[in-house]
Amino acid sequence: MYHVYLLSDATGETVERVARAALTQFRDVDIRLRRMGQIRNREDILRALDEVDRAPGIIFYTLVNTELAQFVRNEVEARQLEAVDLITPLLYKLAEFLEMRPQKLPGLQYEMNSEYYRRMEAVDFTVKQDDGQEPRNLHKADIVLIGVSRSSKTPLSMYLAHKGYKVANVPIIQGIDPPGELEEVEPERVVGLIIDTQRLVDIRSARLRNLRQSPRGSYADYRQVEEELAYCRRFYRAHPAWLVIDVTNKSVEESAAEILSRLHGDIRHD
């Protein structure tokens, strides 16, 4: 059985309709929907996510309060859960199209100005450059993150993008050469991510369990992960001008702050 959790700050009818419409494309699958409405504060969110922890599944949520929506994003990242925000991207796009501020976003204080459009442009760029896509655009990135699978490249990229940085991320895979364009990027813009072996094994194992796959394969095997990280470190040592940070047990916010601090503000946007 697959669990789908529906979080809403109202009755939850809207998020359920969207979820059911999407699920019609997946027949003959045993799916349990769990609707959690009236999510009004952080305590409500924590109670809901504790339930998800006990029976992992995917979360769909519609929270018009942007502070609560951000709190959900932070928590699901920390807990290694899968979640989809169904309303915030839509509201941003409508606000951009209509040149109006949404009426029911009490936490949203942005103005429709060049700063807002620049940040949205950064997000669009970052999405298109995720996981090594379109390497020809690496030279356009403010920051290029590199690292092995599940080392926080994507969540870090998106967090930085929402701060206005154009970010690309490139996977480091043992036995496969990274794109040649990476060597052409100014070294002060490249950040290598490293992580503790056991921590990465735990993250990958949790990922496999969420996908209903066995964690016993090579992807989460301690020795294999150790070899991947050793290969990654050797690759970083061959590029001493690159910044390398350890993301072990750090939140996305902490890792992002370290990256921006250690880059000495050369590409500061805030």
From Swiss-Prot:
This protein's UniProt keywords: Kinase, Nucleotide-binding, Serine/threonine-protein kinase, Transferase
EC number(s) on file: 2.7.11.32, 2.7.4.27
GO molecular function annotations of the record: ADP binding; ATP binding; phosphotransferase activity, phosphate group as acceptor; protein serine/threonine kinase activity
Superkingdom of the organism of origin: Bacteria
Pfam families xrefs: Kinase-PPPase
Binding site for ADP: 147-154
Catalytic activity: N(tele)-phospho-L-histidyl/L-threonyl-[pyruvate, phosphate dikinase] + ADP = N(tele)-phospho-L-histidyl/O-phospho-L-threonyl-[pyruvate, phosphate dikinase] + AMP + H(+); N(tele)-phospho-L-histidyl/O-phospho-L-threonyl-[pyruvate, phosphate dikinase] + phosphate + H(+) = N(tele)-phospho-L-histidyl/L-threonyl-[pyruvate, phosphate dikinase] + diphosphate
Top-level EC class as recorded in UniProt: transferase
Matching InterPro entries: Kinase-pyrophosphorylase, PPDK_reg
Family: Belongs to the pyruvate, phosphate/water dikinase regulatory protein family. PDRP subfamily.
Purpose of the protein: Bifunctional serine/threonine kinase and phosphorylase involved in the regulation of the pyruvate, phosphate dikinase (PPDK) by catalyzing its phosphorylation/dephosphorylation.
Protein name, as recorded: Putative pyruvate, phosphate dikinase regulatory protein
Species the sequence originates in: Citrifermentans bemidjiense (strain ATCC BAA-1014 / DSM 16622 / JCM 12645 / Bem)
Upper taxonomic lineage: Bacteria, Pseudomonadati, Thermodesulfobacteriota, Desulfuromonadia, Geobacterales
